[in-house]
Amino acid sequence: MKKLTAVALGVSMALTLGACSPQQEQNNQQSQQAEETQQQLTSGVILENFDHSAKPQNDLFRYVNGSWIEKTEIPSDRSSIGAFYDLREMNQKRLRDIIEGAAAANPEPGTPERKIGDFFNAYMDTETLNELGAKPIASDLEAIQALDSHEAVAEHMARMFRSGVSIPFGFYVYPDAKDPQTNAMYMYQAGLGLPDRDYYLKDEEKFEDIRSEYVSYITDILGMVGLENTDEAAERILDLETKLAEVQWSRVESRNADKTYNKKTADEVSGMFANFDFKRFIETSELSHVEEMVIRQPSFFEDFGNMFADVDLQTWQDYLSLRLVNEYASALSEEISQRRFDFYGTVLRGTPEQEPRWKRAVDATNSVLGEVLGQVYVKEYFPPEAKEKMEGLIENLRDAYGESIKNLEWMTEETKEKALEKLAKFDPKVGYPNEWRDYSELDISATDLVSNYKAYAEFNYQEEIAKIGGPVDEEDWGMTPQTVNAYYSPVRNEIVFPAGILQPPFFDMDAEMAVNYGGIGAVIGHEMGHGFDDQGSKYDGDGNLQSWWTEADRKAFDERGQKLSEQFSQYEPIEGLNVNGDLTLGENIGDLAGLTIAYEAYKMSLDGEKAPVLDGFTGSQRVFIGWAQVWRGKYREDAIRQQVMRPSLAG
């Protein structure tokens, strides 16, 4: 995003693609000699994926990936395929080896190694799961059906809330945006069964069909767990969730860092809830000690509080039953798990089949015991020299970003000085955390999968609430080392790159650096860019949510951002469905910043020397080829629709 600022939006895509034209750099004797001195390095270019019938200056993506696109089919158990998928697939296999290796060693009960083996085995034991059916949650369903008042519903929501089951609102613990050294409790709208509020509110035929399928799914899944009159319950649930959707904020509104920071006392929050017994909820949630909370969407909580008592008791019982079943369906019988997938996997994302059981078991084990697996993962698959090389890349990108800020013609010196100060304070984290999570208080069974999920939810909940009001742990990570992703945290002013993404095609230790600048370099620049995008730029170098721009500079920046938003809003990946440029603006700024800064950093890294020509491509060309390679991908139409409506790109 900062590149948006740094290059001022005046750089056209045509010029960017033109950088891959072979005529732009001379393949003279000097570059050939440089090539000879670096023959031990590969180009990192995946030549077999190229489509030479395409012109790189017209369609770089197809030029670099066209052959791959034509010959690649999306696996039947996936909604998409691409570079991210390839890495995740490889990591799944690696994690399976780690899990099975730990289990085969017959470790002592209670050890981390025993816990990952027991959890995995419990997930793989389909014979027991099928025999039990819905019995593991029968008592939970009975408790919901026994609720005899709205006060009891509020209290029971608290029990579900702490066990990780979705209710109409949620919370998380994160540094206070206006006191970033202290952890605060943030509350946000939640509780919908469909991916976004628009799935309930849009009149298009596609969404009407999805709602019809949703009603069928609810009818079936609640019947499978033993409830009666589920067709009527399904209609009541859809009606309730539609009412919740009507008062929820849009995703664009929920991106606004200023509007979503609303600190309230516990008494003020209780007053917002009106007819919902929030004090009873807080007591049951063990949150009575929390004096202040940050409310992200205040009007939603007020509207929810007003409507709560108007919704009859039976409807709340239906709704909570569905929330419970949705949460635990994958831990029940194969029949129940399959029915959930038929809707959420096939109807919503177009994926024909579930992944093999072992892959789901690996993902589930990873979601619960990720840092146990992560410790072994980094020892086996992330060499120290990769961390060192990555840290050098980050500093090169930081230098290039600083130069771009200094050269901005439209930004005043006052704002430039503060922007450079923020850039200097970026805290990069690479590979893995310095401190590992302690799972000693978490009990895992080798035979009871649902109890494992419940135990982890309570374990995680107690860890989180203990942080509220306390000092921020600077060593805390938001991702496990094996995660194929990266992120920027504005309130921490940190950029984080787990070991999982630091592999080819993003980061290739055996390749000459040009392709790495186009791959992981652009990812680094992307995350840095988030520090200066339309929302990240509202935080200063210490993570405080406060204005540090002059009024004129903010206006100039917003005008440029609006142009980018308008450009992306013209893109129509599916007929009749346009990208929402306001919603994707942060990611678009990050991408523009990332690639541009990565290219500038690469040129700076040459220090006046000629780049080698490898596989017939100059250094500059390989930077842009590297960028195109990491974004190769194919998507099913339903997956594209969901991605457009709720974008979740890396970072």
Segment roles from a protein language model:
Residues 38-41, 52-58, 63-129:
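Active-site-surrounding "flap" and adjacent substrate/cofactor-binding loops of secreted or lumenal enzymes
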Residues 26-45:
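Post-signal peptide N-terminal segment of mature Sec-exported envelope proteins
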Residues 100-392, 396:
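Noncatalytic, helix-rich "gating/capping" subdomain that lines the substrate-entry/channel surface
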Residues 21-23:
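Bacterial signal peptide processing site
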